[in-house]
């Protein structure tokens, strides 16, 4: 059975849960999204045991620095995601979106060379296992609307306002 180190910490937008395996962050989400967390972890590992840990990989410190507007704080965290090649491509491109900017799902699809795959890009965004650090909140509807965010649109709005330079 796979042992996963889990930590919970307060943030300005609610309690955040971090999950670490093999000295890499594999999941970051909000505590009130526990069902999503369990679904994604079960899909990935089938059987696992959550072991409480205190600030693994200094995630708390890095998130605290981010909330204090240190935009480079996540550079220190090693990530480990799984997903299809397409999802991995989308998630890698999300990490290239500069802090304080947004792009549309259509722009993101074009950027990865799949301009007709807007819906697939949105689905990959929805399956992002590492909220905030892989900044799916920076992707908005073509109209400029803050469409969809697994953690809630109110958090997406807060994060985007927080990141304004």
Model regions: which residues?
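Basic nucleic-acid-binding alpha-helical/helix-turn surface characteristic of O6-alkylguanine DNA
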Residues: 1-115, 165
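Short clusters of hydrophobic/aromatic residues that line enzyme substrate/ligand-binding pockets
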Residues: 77-79, 121, 146-149
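Major-groove recognition helix of helix-turn-helix-like DNA-binding domains
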Residues: 94, 118-127
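LysM (lysin motif) carbohydrate-binding repeats in extracellular/periplasmic proteins that recognize
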Residues: 115-118, 159
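Major-groove DNA-recognition helix of helix-turn-helix-type DNA-binding domains
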Residues: 129, 133
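Short cysteine clusters
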Residues: 136
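Active-site His/Glu-centered metal-binding helix of metallohydrolases
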Residues: 139
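…primarily DNA-binding HTH/wHTH and HhH modules…
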Residues: 142-165
């Amino acid at each position: 059975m796979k042992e996963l180190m889990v930590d919970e910490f307060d943030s300005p937008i609610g309690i955040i849960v971090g999950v670490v395996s093999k000295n890499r962050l594999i999941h970051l989400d909000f505590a009130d999204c526990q069902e999503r967390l369990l679904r994604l972890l079960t899909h990935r590992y089938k059987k696992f045991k959550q072991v409480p840990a205190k600030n693994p990989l200094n995630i708390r410190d890095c998130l605290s620095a981010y909330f204090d507007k240190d935009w480079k704080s996540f550079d220190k965290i090693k990530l480990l995601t799984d997903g299809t090649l397409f999802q991995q491509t989308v998630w890698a491109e999300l990490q290239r979106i500069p802090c304080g900017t947004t792009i549309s799902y259509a722009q993101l699809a074009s950027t990865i060379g799949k301009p007709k795959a807007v819906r697939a890009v949105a689905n990959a965004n929805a399956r992002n296992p590492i909220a905030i650090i892989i900044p799916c909140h920076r992707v908005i509807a073509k109209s400029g609307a803050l469409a969809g965010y697994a953690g809630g649109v109110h958090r997406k709005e807060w994060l985007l306002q927080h990141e304004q330079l």
